């Protein structure tokens, strides 16, 4: 009999992400554990979900676990390859018309010290207002 109690916190997080994705749901996915969780959902939990990533790839069906949202292995198995501007427009339009079908998972690396998503600002040694 298999021991299903021997798992890491990261494995449980990826599984929890996969289990929270519903059939036919559009899933905006960030790098890291969200990408692993969405890949697991697409392959094992609900194959009809539609993962999309900020690099413009939609309805991705990865054969291997991609390292990032721009991984070429990820690009080879997706339904649509859009420029980023179309991705943002699609996301906004979908939220306005059918918000129940849209869910997003982002990783901790995508959140700055002020709680903003990295599209707001990521800075190193500089000032927050002038990174």
What are these regions (language model features)?
Residues 1-82:
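N-terminal active-site beta-alpha-beta segment that forms phosphate/nucleotide-binding
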Residues 2, 9, 65-131:
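Conserved phosphate- and dinucleotide-binding cores of soluble alpha/beta proteins
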